[in-house]
Amino acid sequence: MTGGVRRRLPCLLCLVVLAGCGGGSDSVTVPKGFNLRTVEKPAFSVALPSAWRSFGDRSHTNAREVAGKNERLRTELETLARSDSPIKLVAFDPAAGRRFYTNMNVLQTQVPSKLSFDDMARTETTQISRASGVTDIRQQETRVPAGRTLRLTYRPRANAVVQQYFVRHGDLLYVLTYTTRESDAARYAKTFDRSAHTFQVG
């Protein structure tokens, strides 16, 4: 296992808790009821439900004002605001309630250029499955406009379900993490998947 992959795992699982290989660019059709959210540095875009609020590289927002009493969301927004933050986009569904927001984030990190997609997929799946509290992990390979993608679905703790997409693009790895309550997982599963399948780089 590479040091970069090992160091990234605690950050990925931390983002899940706080939140409550490269290919050519394909054309993207934005689903009805969604709109495209674009981040300029690094350059990528992803479609989200129109009602969702999102904050990216040009966000200058008061985290306390936006998050209210939701400590998890506030911490994530404060992390986003740091210049060295691996988080590049944070979004949430304001209709989900203030104690737990259904949410997503996009993390960008570098990976060794020699690390193949298959090796990356095995490493990420193994490391997350070994993490404390993670259960019911399911793995699937898919493809989004940005390239070949690993999709993992799992429960990081009681009353939460995560859908996570690992997109390799050159020597960069983009991780799209969608989190909701266990009781809402079936309702949001298609929304998360439709969103992830619009992700493109550049």
Locations of regions flagged by a protein language model:
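N-terminal targeting sequences that direct proteins away from the cytosol to non-cytosolic compartments
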Residues: 1-84, 96, 179-202
